[in-house]
Amino acid sequence: MEHDTSSNGNCRERILEAAGEIFAEFGFRGATVRKICERAKVNIAAINYYFGGKEKLYSEVLRHWHDFAIKKYPLFFGVGEDAPVEEQLRGFIRSFLFRLLDKGKPAWFGKLMMREMTEPTRAFERLVKEIVRPRDKVLASLVGKMIGTPVSEEEIRLCCASIIGQCLYYYNARSIIKRLYRQDVTQPDEIERIADHVMQFSLKGLEHNSKHSEDRTKIEAESQISDPMTGSSPRIPHSAREIDPVF
């Protein structure tokens, strides 16, 4: 099959956009090469020519549109890395929510990502390695700085999950929210309002977690102080050692 090289870029872009829509709608297994080519208005052999098959196309769709979304909504939403950590966290939350909820191009990207999380394909490992894990490390670093005192990896992970979970709720429940409260969470002003709420709610949780960690560190330090008369550590009442867990 001959291809007009002058239109190669345009053809490739049409395939990527059409494939993203089809994969988001039907999933990897339900999407067919024929459906994608019909949507893109290209020859059925074009997918093999440009991408080497459906599976490689799927991986490229995830990478291409994630890069597009990050370019549109950078990880910190324009907040500099030298900005206060609280502002960086706010930027992170805003960016994540806009990538999930924005109705602009590509509006289907959030749906496609959710599909991959719930119905993993062979592209899942690459998705985790190139997209999810780097984002997770950034958020974990911010959370650790916000808490301030030494905390376990598990505690940081729980805090990160709580922040991400709040954001995902508004994506997964957007239809129910609209029906119950007549609130369209895909509108920019609503996304900003949600971001403010998630930020404030998360700040309170992180502050409580920080105090919890400080109290525990203090108790552990006191337990190591030896009694000058006996040379043994004083007994701390059981109730004083038990600090209510945050989560």
Each language-model region and where it sits:
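Short hydrophobic clusters on alpha-helical segments that form packing/core surfaces
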Residues: 15-23, 163, 202
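Hydrophobic alpha-helical bundle segments that form small-molecule/ligand-binding pockets
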Residues: 133-157, 180-183, 206-211
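Hydrophobic alpha-helical connector segments
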Residues: 74-109, 156-163
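An amphipathic alpha-helix adjacent to DNA-recognition modules
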Residues: 9-17, 50-78, 125, 129
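Amphipathic alpha-helical segments used for helix-helix packing
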Residues: 104-126, 174-180
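Helix-turn-helix
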Residues: 14, 22-56, 60, 64
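Amphipathic alpha-helical packing segments from all-alpha helical-bundle domains
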Residues: 87, 121-147, 196, 200
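N-terminal intrinsically disordered/low-complexity leader segments
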Residues: 1-10, 211-247
